[in-house]
Amino acid sequence: MRRAGFTLIEMLVAIMILSIMTIVSALVFSSVVNAWEKSVVMVDRMQTADYALGQIVAGLRSAYYPPTGEQKDEWGMALYDNGEGEDPGESDVLEWTKLGSAIIGNKSTLADTVHRVRIWVEEERSKDEPGGLWARVWNNDLDNAEANDRSTDEEPGEEFLLVEDVVGFDCVVQKDPKESDEDGRPKWEEEWATSNQIPFRVKLTFRMKTPEKGDEPLPLLRVVEIPLWDLSQNPRR
């Protein structure tokens, strides 16, 4: 009686099938791990960015306007349009005057004073100074008094990085809630230089770098209504 067994061809086919299954399993596992790692990185970035952008929203809601309506030019809100905000070179610059600890923290010496804030996006300066959303804060009255002790090329106040991995910033403002386009949507303005008024609404679009090179930046949108808009339109006399 002949003993049953595997032929050489059957063994080779079995080994080939096992090899294919091993390779496919390894590829699937690698893809899952890579996707998980990228999602963790992106979630971490989004959480950090969400906190920083929340600070900006709080800072805009804390915009300062004198009750008498006598607004100095150097305290007014200013929006400089540099493009669509797709990259640092085309990103806008926003300045305004505020009260409170938003953006600067409650330990800052400026937290209890009226101070000015500027935000913009910048590329990486060096290994120690990464690119992202930057801010500068200062008090005009205090810095003007200390101007003689400062180099003429040195900007006033303190500069710091708010959040990394922001590669673009676009900002538009709505002057009045009644202003709308033909479709009834808010009419947005790309620039703002009216120092004696505050816009009714500000729309901020930040673009976050994704973990995968070559992917389009992920936009984060914030729309803020400024409480003191009505006071800037109807100052108390």
Each model region followed by its residue ranges:
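Short linear sequence signals and composition-biased patches located at protein termini or domain-edge surfaces
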Residues: 160-237
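Short, solvent-exposed loop/helix junctions and linker helices
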Residues: 2, 46, 50, 156, ...
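Sequence-level motif detector for i,i+2 pairs with an aromatic at +2
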Residues: 89-91, 157, 199
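Extracytoplasmic beta-strand-rich oligomerization domains located immediately C-terminal to a leader/signal peptide
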Residues: 26-152
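N-terminal single-pass transmembrane signal-anchor helix
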Residues: 2-29
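General secondary-structure edge motif
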Residues: 5-8, 12, 35-36, 99, ...
